[in-house]
Amino acid sequence: MMKKVILLISTLIFLFSIAYAGNFGVGIIAGEPTGISFRLWQNKVNAFDFGIAWSIDANILHVSVDYVTHNYGIFKPTSGTMPFYYGIGLRILAKDNANFGVRVPLGIIFIPKGTTLDFFFEIVPTLNLVPATNLDVDGAVGFRYYF
């Protein structure tokens, strides 16, 4: 199992290395689970989100990757932007046995004007597929700094 986690982390590092200025963010995600959040913008509307986090309650490592799309027309702050985002992704839980599921991230991200930061809130329903089929819901708040 650890070989798979190391392979996934290596793949993420490769993807991050192709990022260009201002499109790659790293930050903290707090909630269930808590850890590190990465975002790689593809354009103004689409991005890849990656997470490596630890579940305090269940003592499990979470590794996730999502493809998200942003809708800028719902919320209109007076300064900056605040799109609603939604997408699809995958999650692996690593403990004694591997647990694999499909995620549907739903969130709001605030991007202050003139900064290299974003702040986000998300709820992520997840359909676990292996080793058993069941539904999970994770939630978190966080921020990222963009390079």
For each feature predicted by the language model, list its residue ranges.
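Residues that define the transmembrane beta-barrel architecture of outer-membrane proteins
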Residues: 22, 32-34, 46, 59-63, ...
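Transmembrane beta-strand segments that form the barrel wall of outer-membrane beta-barrel proteins
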Residues: 22-32, 42-56, 84-94, 119-127
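N-terminal, post-signal-peptide region of Sec/Tat-exported proteins
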Residues: 44-80
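Predominantly the C-terminal beta-signal and adjacent terminal strand-loop region
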Residues: 113-147
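Short loop/turn motifs that connect adjacent beta-strands in outer-membrane beta-barrel proteins
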Residues: 19-23, 44-45, 72-83, 96-98, ...
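Residues on the lipid-exposed face of transmembrane beta-strands in outer-membrane beta-barrel proteins
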Residues: 28, 36-40, 52, 65-71, ...
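Gram-negative outer-membrane beta-barrel proteins
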Residues: 34-36, 56-58, 73-75, 94-98, ...
